[in-house]
Structure formats: C-alpha cells, structure tokens
Amino acid sequence: MNIRPLHDRVLVKRQEVELKSAGGIVLTGSAAGKSTRGTVVAVGKGRILDNGETKSLDVKIGDVVIFNEGYGAKTEKIDNEELLILTESDILAIVEE
C-alpha cells in the first residue's frame, strides 16, 4: 500500500530504541520508552500559505529526524510497519552525520 501525505504532513518510520543503558543495564517496559528519532519515508507537497502559495518542506525522503510526538501525531500500521504521520512543525531537527 502507498500513502502520500497531504500538505505539510510527513510520514516517518520510527527508529528502534536502544534497549541497553550506557552502563549496560537492559531496559524493559516503560523504561525503554519510544524513540523520538526516525527516517522520513514520504512528504507532502508543502504548507499552504495565507496567500495561497505552497511553501515546500525543509525535510526530504531519507532524512533522519528528531520529532516531538505531539497530540496531532497519528500512528498507522502499513504493511506490518508502524509509521507516524506528523506535521513538519512536529519535527524538531534533521540529524546530519
């Protein structure tokens, strides 16, 4: 199945969270938490401005991003993969390595 986000929405595949602490302790349950880092797999065409023009997004497919999973974030299971639908404003940073 293909999903094409609309407007300023971004489809993100969450990265796996590290299940060991820096000291080597295995984390379980709520201590492990959910990662707020992921890879952009699809982007919308952009945000529609008040004057009707479309401003393209700053993120692109393949970018690794850090995001805030706010109240507007939606989780969808697509082809047995959990993906997040976020607005670009939910993305806090692009990770450059």
Swiss-Prot record:
One of its GO terms (molecular function) is ATP binding. One of its GO terms (cellular component) is cytoplasm. SUPFAM superfamilies: GroES-like. It comes from the Bacteria. Keywords: Chaperone, Cytoplasm. One of its GO terms (biological process) is chaperone cofactor-dependent protein refolding. SMART domains: Cpn10 (SM00883). This is Co-chaperonin GroES. The gene is groES.
